[in-house]
C-alpha cells in the first residue's frame, strides 16, 4: 500500500515537472519559429514573408472560411420531428385513460428545395472559395513585391553607407597627410582647419546613411513579422540582378517596342486580381440565377402516426408557401445590380492592369538606359578624375577646393549609380508583378 502511494506521488511529480518545463520552453520554441536568420537572401525574405506576414495569414484564413461556406451551402435541409398531444381532459374529475383519451401525433417533415436552389447555392459558394484562393495569391504577389522593394531599399542604404564611410576615410587620410605637411611648413594652418570643418559634411553623410539603413532594416523586419524590429541583419544579395532571377526576358521585353502587347496579354491572363474579378462576375451571374430560383417556393412533405382517442391512423401532409405578396423582387433586383457592379469592377481591374504594365515598362526601359549611360559616361571618368586630383593635391599641384570638388563629385556619382541600379532592379520586379509572373524568382 505504501509502495503504491509512493509510486503515485512520483508519477504526479513527474507530470507536474514536465508541465512546468513545457510552459517554460514554449515561449522559446515560438520565438525560434518566428526568428529571422542573421544572414538573409532576397529569396529567403520573400518566403518568410509569404509564410508569416499577418496579411497572408488572414488571406489563408479567408480561404478556409470560404471553404466552410461551400460546405454549408452544399448541405440539404434537416428533417423535422414533431410530437403533438391534444384533447386530453386534464382538468375533469373523471379522466379517461391517457392513451385513449387524446389525439397523439408523431410526424416527420422534410423540406424539398425546388428550382435547383442547392446546386446554385453551391456554385455561388464555390465561386467565393475560388475568389478567396485567387485573392490570397494576389496578396502574396503584392507582399512579394513589397518585400523585394524593402530588401533592396536596405541594400541601397547599405551601399550608400559604404560610399559615405569610404569618403570619410579618404578625408581622414588627407587630414593626416596635411598635419604632416603643416609640421613641415608646406601648408598653412588655415587649409588644415578648412579641411577639418569640411569633414563634418562627410560625417553627416555617414550618420544619415546609418539612420536610413536602420529604418530600411526595420521596414523589412516588419514585413517579415519579426518579433523585434531592431534585430541585426546581414543582407546577402546586392543591387545588381543575377541571372538566376529570370529577369532577362523582362529586360528584353522592356527594350523591345513589340514587347508591351505580349506582356499585357500575359497580365490579363495570369494576374490573380484579374482572375478574381472574372470569378466574381461568374459568382454574380450565378447569384442572380439563385435569386430568381427563390421565387419558386419550397415544398415540405410530412407524414407520421396518429392515435385519435384510441384509433390508430396515418397522417400525411404537404406544405407550400403561396407567393402572393413576395416573389423575391428585392433579391432579384439586388443581385442584378451586383452583377452589373461586378462587370464594372472587372473592366476597372483590366484598366488598372494595363496602366500598371505600361508604367512598369516605361520605368524598366528608362532605368535600363540610365544605368548603361552612367556606366558608359560617368562611373569610370569620375573615379579617374578623383584619383588624378587626389594625387595632384598630395603633390601640391592642385588646391584644396579642387580636391573637395572631385571628392564630392565621385561620391555623388557613386550614390547616383547605386540609386540607378536600385531603380532598375525594382522596376523589373514591378514589371514582373504587373505581368503576374510567378516564375520570376526573387
Language-model-detected regions and their locations in the chain:
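Bacterial N-terminal signal peptides
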Residues: 12-27
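A glycine-/polar-enriched beta->alpha junction
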Residues: 47-57, 64-79, 106-124, 134-141, ...
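Bacterial Sec-pathway N-terminal export signals of envelope proteins
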Residues: 31-88, 102, 107-112, 120, ...
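Amphipathic alpha-helical coiled-coil segments
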Residues: 58-70, 139, 143-164, 173-175, ...
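Acidic, low-complexity, intrinsically disordered peripheral segments
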Residues: 1-10, 32-34, 416-442
